[in-house]
């Protein structure tokens, strides 16, 4: 089985990649740190081509998520494959006193959640799991003085939910510590 994952070299993406490798999956990763920036057209084309024989697409990197989700969905429409979409609990809860630097992030994640809902209305397949964790223990949010979820716990949950995709339909999971 093959997993295509964005943002696979840090944080949740790194931990999730390692979990899938431990389960015997082949990983094809896209990350700024391996010169596979998912906002560049040549990288996007490579990713879409890579998804033709993949079973799972983990839409983890913040950049270009809605566009990638839509393109992979169109490629896989009607096929028994799975998109694991990493959104944010920040779209569900009402946070207070957040820095303005997060406004674009919040807007992008809300757009992503809307895109998920619209695509699900088109077809039940591919499966789309929308995972919305709150703050995750990563360097990116180390400056925020708030409770954070261990990325290993989230990755374990995601793998478990993927394995249950035929038993229950996973639509939206909001995780908060």
Where are the language model's segments positioned?
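C-terminal helical subdomain
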Residues: 130, 145-177
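Conserved amphipathic alpha-helix within the SDR
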Residues: 42-53, 73-74
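N-terminal Rossmann NAD(P)H-binding glycine-rich loop of SDR-like oxidoreductase domains
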Residues: 5-22
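Hydrophobic structural elements of the Rossmann-like NAD(P)H-binding subdomain
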Residues: 58, 84, 126-131, 141
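Catalytic loop of short-chain dehydrogenase/reductase
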Residues: 77, 81-122, 134-138
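Conserved NAD(P)H cofactor-binding loop of Rossmann-fold oxidoreductase domains
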Residues: 56-65, 87-90
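Adenosine-cofactor binding site in Rossmann-like domains, unifying the SAM/SAH pocket
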Residues: 27-47, 67
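NAD(P)-cofactor binding segment of oxidoreductase domains
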Residues: 62-83
